[in-house]
């Protein structure tokens, strides 16, 4: 595919092009900037990666709107397209060369489907899938091998369930969701009441709701509560190995990275970003547009738009100032001890 054909298929409106329109290389694939070979298209997102332009073997680049970077590519004879969102354009270009595996609609003979289940049109149900009573499956749903769907579950149109995931009782999965292998949606919340003789198990009668366009990574667990619902909002993306406890309410457009854990009743607003290994304590709230950096421990509420780091969480700028002092602490302590000794000696005179 010619570079010019890629640009036209991306339907970009706000962009600029290389000053050599006669150079229109054949693009055979996509590659990271440091792994690109002749015939591949790559991208650079920001100025801190500009040094790669001098070393890359890519035939074409998607660049930010940075004249210095564009001139550098021009000098090397690399054709380019500049846009305010190079990573987004690169992601769209990948889709021109790669299409994920989509099985032909069918129901495999080894699938076990209860007669009360309702199955939509153009559905694929793979080997050894188990679909229990009262389940409703929308149109165009793909259910890969060994998936287990408990009673009363509802799954919206075009949702994809990858192999070996489990959707437990009464869960409601929206349209265009993707649930990856090993995930468990709607498992029992951690509900036990202490008594004088041990723990009394509180039945978890609630359910989980995933709104439309939610992505759930491998081995992530989202628990149902004792009453009510656990909810994940529209277009939220959740990475692998995330634990979301009973009764959590997650807003729309959030991004949650791997190994994050939320205790019961946590509430996230819209567009909240959690980096890896964030821990959030019971009932804590994070406002719209707030962010927690990696390994943050959130014990109290976070204001809308606030960026926090550390344990317990503090404003990110304050955390950076404190972190800058860590390496100086031994010298500061020695200086303090020396001053202390001098004062003690002066006190003896």
Curated annotation (Swiss-Prot):
Q: What is this protein called?
A: UDP-3-O-acylglucosamine N-acyltransferase
**Keywords per UniProt:** Acyltransferase, Lipid A biosynthesis, Lipid biosynthesis, Lipid metabolism, Repeat, Transferase
Q: Name one GO molecular function term.
A: structural constituent of carboxysome shell
Q: Which gene encodes it?
A: lpxD
Alphabetical GO CC annotations of the entry are: carboxysome; membrane
Catalytic activity annotation: a UDP-3-O-[(3R)-3-hydroxyacyl]-alpha-D-glucosamine + a (3R)-hydroxyacyl-[ACP] = a UDP-2-N,3-O-bis[(3R)-3-hydroxyacyl]-alpha-D-glucosamine + holo-[ACP] + H(+)
Oligomer and partners: Homotrimer.
The taxonomy runs: Bacteria, Bacillati, Cyanobacteriota, Cyanophyceae, Nostocales
Origin organism is Trichormus variabilis (strain ATCC 29413 / PCC 7937)
Active site per the UniProt annotation: 246 (proton acceptor)
Biological process (GO) annotations? lipid A biosynthetic process
């Amino acid at each position: 595919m010619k570079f010019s054909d890629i640009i036209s298929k991306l339907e970009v409106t706000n962009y600029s092009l290389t000053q050599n329109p006669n150079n229109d290389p054949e693009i055979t694939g996509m590659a990271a900037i440091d792994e690109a070979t002749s015939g591949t298209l790559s991208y650079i997102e920001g100025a801190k990666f500009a040094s790669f332009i001098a070393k890359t073997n890519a035939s074409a680049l998607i660049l930010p709107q940075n004249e210095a970077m564009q001139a550098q590519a021009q000098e090397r004879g690399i054709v380019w397209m500049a846009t305010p969102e190079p990573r987004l354009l690169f992601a769209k270009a990948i889709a021109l060369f790669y299409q994920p595996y989509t099985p032909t609609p069918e129901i495999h003979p080894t699938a076990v489907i209860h007669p009360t289940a309702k199955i939509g049109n153009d559905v694929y149900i793979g080997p050894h899938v188990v679909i229990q009573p009262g389940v409703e499956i929308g149109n165009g749903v793909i259910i890969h091998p060994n998936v287990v769907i408990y009673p009363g579950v509802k799954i919206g149109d075009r949702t994809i369930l990858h192999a070996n995931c489990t959707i437990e009782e009464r869960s409601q999965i929206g349209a265009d969701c993707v649930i990856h292998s090993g995930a468990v949606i709607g498992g029992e919340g951690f509900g036990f009441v202490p008594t004088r003789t041990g723990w009394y198990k509180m039945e978890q009668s609630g359910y989980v709701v995933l709104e439309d366009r939610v992505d759930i990574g491998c081995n992530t667990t989202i628990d149902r509560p004792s009453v009510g619902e656990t909810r994940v909002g529209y277009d939220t993306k959740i990475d692998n190995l995330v634990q979301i406890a009973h009764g959590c309410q997650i807003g729309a457009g959030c991004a949650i990275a791997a190994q994050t854990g939320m205790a019961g009743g946590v509430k996230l607003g819209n567009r909240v970003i959690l980096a890896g290994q964030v821990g959030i304590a019971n009932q804590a709230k994070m406002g719209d547009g707030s962010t927690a950096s990696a390994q943050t421990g959130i014990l109290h509420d976070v204001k809308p738009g606030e960026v926090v780091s550390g344990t317990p969480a503090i404003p990110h700028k304050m955390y950076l100032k404190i972190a800058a002092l860590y390496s100086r602490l031994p010298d500061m302590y020695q200086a303090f001890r020396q001053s202390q000794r001098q004062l003690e000696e002066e006190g003896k005179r």
